Curated annotation (Swiss-Prot):
SUPFAM superfamilies per record: ITPase-like (SSF52972)
Protein name listed in UniProt: dTTP/UTP pyrophosphatase
Enzyme class: hydrolase
Role summary: Nucleoside triphosphate pyrophosphatase that hydrolyzes dTTP and UTP. May have a dual role in cell division arrest and in preventing the incorporation of modified nucleotides into cellular nucleic acids.
Length: 203
């Protein structure tokens, strides 16, 4: 058992850090880029890859990349957690916008639309890897050009799938949400806690 031990978080997301703290998980952030050059995961969907499968694959690859970093840096061998969030609209995957124009286009598409948010969380320890998925339905109200422009000025869209963060000002865009609020934020707490317990952590 790894009771009261730490994990490594293979993510720079402040939201995921906050959520792990919320459920009492001790962690160290694992900066993948600092290990033997760039170790980033290429976040590109395969042709025909469904959004939930893409999220699972990305989370698994991030955890695996983190585990390689543990090996290379000869770190204490705690489990590595990776996660990935994707927004799906009409079968299209909306990832992190490349720039402000891309963010504006995404938000315009999400206006008055129901979309799905898929967040996968994966844990690797030695050769063992497991993954869980949370999928939620989110409906936005009407977003006119002025409202989108004001939101873009906040910069909240940066680094966020679908160009919004539900825990920030975009929370006012949500007409309804069916599923996991923490999953839409970026780390589904129910699935995360269940997965960490399977790896022997006290949650």
């Amino acid at each position: 058992m790894l009771v009261d031990k730490r994990i490594y978080l293979a993510s720079q997301s402040p939201r995921r850090r906050e959520l792990l703290k919320q459920i009492g998980i001790a962690y160290d952030v694992l900066p993948l880029r600092a290990v033997s050059g760039r170790m980033d995961v290429l976040e590109v969907a395969h042709a025909g890859e469904a959004a939930p499968d893409f999220a699972r694959r990305m989370a698994t690859e991030k955890a695996a990349c983190g585990w390689r970093a543990v090996d290379l840096r000869r770190l204490l061998r705690f489990p590595v957690l990776g996660a990935d969030t994707v927004v799906e609209l009409d079968g299209d995957i909306l990832g992190k916008p490349a720039d402000r124009a891309a963010a504006k286009a995404m938000l315009a598409r999400l206006s008055r639309s129901e979309h799905r948010v898929h967040t996968a969380v994966a844990v690797q320890h030695e050769s063992r890897v497991d993954v869980r998925l949370s999928s939620s339905r989110v409906k936005f109200g009407a977003l006119d050009d002025a409202l989108i422009a004001r939101y873009l000025e906040t910069g909240e869209y940066l680094g966020k799938a679908g160009a919004y963060g539900i825990q920030g000002r975009a929370g006012a865009f949500v007409e309804y949400l069916e599923g996991s609020y923490s999953g839409v934020m970026g780390l589904p707490l129910y699935e995360t806690a269940a997965l960490l317990r399977e790896f022997g952590l006290a949650v």
